[in-house]
Each structure stands twice: as structure tokens, then as C-alpha cells.
């Protein structure tokens, strides 16, 4: 069996629980040596054979996989981030299909999620942008004209741009030609979640100068759009008591007093906003699992709390009805003020339609 595994954006503890389990069980590991944190290789079992695919062609990779298949060995093909983004996995899967080799995919945390975490931002701010465009500049791999930077820039959505750090002068020109003003907020994030992570806030017009000043020439993502500033947004309807959802009925009125009454925060405990992944707990990262384990208090919807209780039965749990999200945020801050480390848990990634924005809003107020 071949497992195509996303290693996460860089930090060793951002591989998922499932990905780590598969890595530990593998007889053979083929990893993207130029991008995957080599520290993950310490998790392989004794006797595992490790190949660095940065020095291999597709044909050489497939020779290793085919031989392992014949010998009934478990293979992990370890890709950076999430394999579905710029991972070149389709050609590998096509080759395995022709050979009759079975495989599966273990998703990973993409570097664009790590980038949002590094910037402490939410990509999808109400009233500013509800869409994220993930793209790249044309290089040795061409980009269709309909998907050019200039075409996408006309949408004025949040843009996360991969594989383009060496072309920032041209990138700025294309962004402005597409409609972004020169002073549109932008950010450069170098090696998101790695120990050497670096974040630079700048503008569309000054991308190249900012990168040169900080000596950033590769391995960085570019974020463009008014969401980078993280201000001027509308209140989220998702957590507004006056808004009806499938899970709750609207309250008759909403005074806004919960937000305005939040006291000045001088927290002595730590507050973590933790994305639990897409579903089952083996989709959670080691970092997320550790953050929850390190906290005395866990706050969240009852359904999420029930998922983690079997693993953390001795924690203090804060669960409120679905009309009381802001109250739960306030209670979490109050626990921090009492010196208790607190985890606010939510599904998926906390920065994409998640709790991070509401926690930020309540905290600021």
C-alpha cells in the first residue's frame, strides 16, 4: 500500500495524527527533501529505508514504489503541506493506476493555513472578502491566461500567491494592472511555522523592496488584499444572536452589550484557538492535540467537546448554547485572566470561517 501523506507546512508537530501514524509504520519513505522538515524522519521505525525525492525523477520514484509493492512493503510518499496543492501527485497516481498499485491520500495542513497563523489573520472577513484565490505566477510551469495574476486581481478578493518570490517586481505590476491600488496591504511570509519563520507586512507596490530588505528570495508565500490589515470588517452573522442558523433560532433582539462589556484583558494564562481538522480526531495535528492537552480549560460547542473528552477527561469544559458564542469567548478570556491556559476548539482551520475572527473581535473590544 502507498500512502500519499501531507507533512504540513513546516513545523514537525503540524503533521496530522494519521499522517504521523502512517509515517511510523512505513517500511519505505520517499520525502520531498527540499521542503519537508527532516526532523519528521526521526519518527520512522528502525530499518525504514528513506529516499530524498528532490534528487529523483518521477521514473526513479516509481521504480522504488513498484519494487516495494512487489515486496508487499508499506510506502509513505511524504509531500510538503497538503499534497493536493502544487504537489505533482496526479502523475504519480496515474502511474500507480497503470501498475495496479493501491494508494490513498492523507491530507495535510497547507502552508497557506500556516501563513494565516503566522500573520494571526482570518482570510475571510465579512464586508471585505469572502473568497480566497490560491494561485502562482507563470514560470517554467505556464499558467492559462484566464488564470493570470492580472485576471484574478480584478476580483479584489484575498489572494495567496505561491512559488513567486523570485518575481516580485513583475508580480506587483500585474497586481496593480489588474486593479489593486499601490497601497493595498500585502504580506510576505517566509517558511511559515518553521523555526526561522519571518513575516513582513508591506503594500502591493513595495513587495520587491520589502523582500530585498529582509533578504527573502524563496520559500515564501505572498498574501494580498484588504484582509491583510484585519480591520474595517463587519460583524460575523455566524455568531450573531439575531441571526438564525440551522442549529439555533434567533433571539428577539441583540443589544451588542456582550462585546462592548468585555473588560480590558490583562491575561496571565494563554489562550489557544485550535482548529480540530475536517472530521475525525486523527485529522488533527500534533500541535493542536498538544495545545489542548496543555490547557486546563477547553471551550467549544458540545459536539466538539464530546469528541475530545475521552482523551482529556480531567479538563474543565466550557460549553454554551449556540446563541452564546460571544459569551463563551468572554468566559474563555476570563479563565485566562484567572491564570488558566484555555483552548477554544472549532472545526477545520480556525482562520477560515472559524472562531479566530470572533475571538479577535471580542479580544480587541
Regions found by a protein language model. Give the residues of each.
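Glycine-rich, flexible N-terminal cofactor/catalytic loop recognition
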Residues: 1-55, 151, 262-318
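A contiguous loop/helix-start segment that scaffolds small-molecule binding in enzyme catalytic cores
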Residues: 2-4, 60, 71-75, 131, ...
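Short glycine-rich anion-binding loops that position phosphate/pyrophosphate groups of nucleotides
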Residues: 9-12, 35, 80-84, 139-140, ...
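Short, acidic/turn-prone active-site loops that include or flank metal/cofactor-
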Residues: 9-10, 34-36, 52-59, 109-111, ...
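Class I SAM-dependent methyltransferase SAM-binding "motif I" and its flanking Rossmann-like core
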Residues: 11, 84-155, 198-201, 280, ...
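Short, solvent-exposed amphipathic alpha-helical segments in soluble enzyme
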Residues: 18-22, 44-47, 92-95, 149-152, ...
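General beta-strand structural signal in soluble alpha/beta enzymes
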Residues: 31-33, 52, 76-80, 103-108, ...
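Short phosphate-binding loop-to-helix
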Residues: 56-70, 88, 323-340, 351
